[in-house]
Amino acid sequence: MKQHINKPTFKVGIGYDVHKFDNIEYDATNTFITICGIKINHHKKIVAHSDGDVGLHALTDAILGAVGCGSIGQHFPNTDNKWKDAKSDYFLIEAKNKAQEKGYYISNADIIIICEQPKIMPHALKMQEYIANLIKIDTSCINVKATTTEKLGFLGRKEGIAAQAIVLCCLQN
């Protein structure tokens, strides 16, 4: 295989994650889910091996993909008890560190949370600030938005939550 003489200046990665909600109804004032690092009250819990943060999982996957380091499942497999109930912050920081080891920094990221409930947009700015602080970049370089599936499919039936992320990594000078 022919090697590049120079590393590419820009690399793009795409990430995706989905988790189902459990089937138990909880008191939403005492129950929360974590999305993009922010706790949001919700009447269902996420079923996951780690903390189930679909936003941070998708972003982690996008960063790892951009710099050619595989996927979140390869680095933090849900078959390994080491990652049971792990905070997704750790996954994201590790992905950022891997990008830096390869000579890249995260330029910007766009994350979309897909669900009928809970409502994400009231928390989007806090999510952006949380992620930016975690990976040490300007808040203007992180975007979090939300959409629904217009009540179609398992997400439309409120059976789960999903996220997609795209990230641009740039070669460090």
From Swiss-Prot:
Binding site for 4-CDP-2-C-methyl-D-erythritol 2-phosphate: 17-19, 49-50, 76-80, 147-150, 154, 157
Residues the record marks as site: Transition state stabilizer: 49, 148
Catalytic activity: 4-CDP-2-C-methyl-D-erythritol 2-phosphate = 2-C-methyl-D-erythritol 2,4-cyclic diphosphate + CMP
Residues that bind a divalent metal cation: 17, 19, 57
Cofactor note: Binds 1 divalent metal cation per subunit.
Keywords per UniProt: Isoprene biosynthesis, Lyase, Metal-binding
SUPFAM superfamilies the record matches: IpsF-like (SSF69765)
Pathway the protein takes part in: Isoprenoid biosynthesis; isopentenyl diphosphate biosynthesis via DXP pathway; isopentenyl diphosphate from 1-deoxy-D-xylulose 5-phosphate: step 4/6
Annotated family: Belongs to the IspF family.
Known partners and oligomeric status: Homotrimer.
Protein name: 2-C-methyl-D-erythritol 2,4-cyclodiphosphate synthase
Gene: ispF
